[in-house]
Amino acid sequence: MPQSFTSIAKIGDFILKTPLLSKICVPVSKQYIKYSGYRKLGLRFDDLIAEENPIMQTALKRLPEGESYARNYRIIRAHQSELTKHLLPRNEWVKAQDDVPYLLPYILEAEAAAKEKEDLDNLELSKK
């Protein structure tokens, strides 16, 4: 069973709260982000999350219209850059301070709603 975004967020919070793990994992993650190169294509981290599951589809529907258009523009521009085998100019790269999780709150909200729906669907009533 794949991990939920809620469990991944909890693991991330645990790592950041633990000083030893934070000293090890944060520099490694920064290097990973640097070498992955998605910021050089103008993408943010949340643009990389696969859209093919119902939770993500629900989260994308809840995304504000302006942010949704910006997301689609970033993805189309990145595809165009890949097709032409060129990176964006350095001034158009996404900076670290601009790469904030804009979609994660909606994903966590959609997961909570799906879990609540599943719990209610599997509810068993008993007589006392």
Curated annotation (Swiss-Prot):
Q: Which InterPro entries match?
A: QCR7 (IPR003197), QCR7_sf (IPR036544)
Q: Where are the transmembrane segments?
A: none
Compartments in which it is found: Mitochondrion inner membrane
Task: Give Gene Ontology CC terms.
Answer: matrix side of mitochondrial inner membrane; respiratory chain complex III
- UniProt-recorded Gene Ontology molecular function terms: ubiquinol-cytochrome-c reductase activity
What is its membrane topology?
Peripheral membrane protein
Query: Would you say which domain of life the source belongs to?
Result: Eukaryota
A single Gene Ontology biological process assigned to it is: mitochondrial electron transport, ubiquinol to cytochrome c
Which keywords has UniProt assigned to this entry?
Electron transport, Membrane, Mitochondrion, Mitochondrion inner membrane, Respiratory chain, Transport
Main location (coarse class): mitochondrion
Write out the similarity annotation.
Belongs to the UQCRB/QCR7 family.
Q: How does it assemble?
A: Component of the ubiquinol-cytochrome c oxidoreductase (cytochrome b-c1 complex, complex III, CIII), a multisubunit enzyme composed of 3 respiratory subunits cytochrome b, cytochrome c1 and Rieske protein, 2 core protein subunits, and additional low-molecular weight protein subunits. The complex exists as an obligatory dimer and forms supercomplexes (SCs) in the inner mitochondrial membrane with cytochrome c oxidase (complex IV, CIV).
What role does this protein play?
Component of the ubiquinol-cytochrome c oxidoreductase, a multisubunit transmembrane complex that is part of the mitochondrial electron transport chain which drives oxidative phosphorylation.
Q: Could you tell me what this protein is called?
A: Cytochrome b-c1 complex subunit 7
The organism's taxonomy opens as:
Eukaryota, Fungi, Dikarya, Ascomycota, Saccharomycotina
Q: Which gene encodes it?
A: QCR7
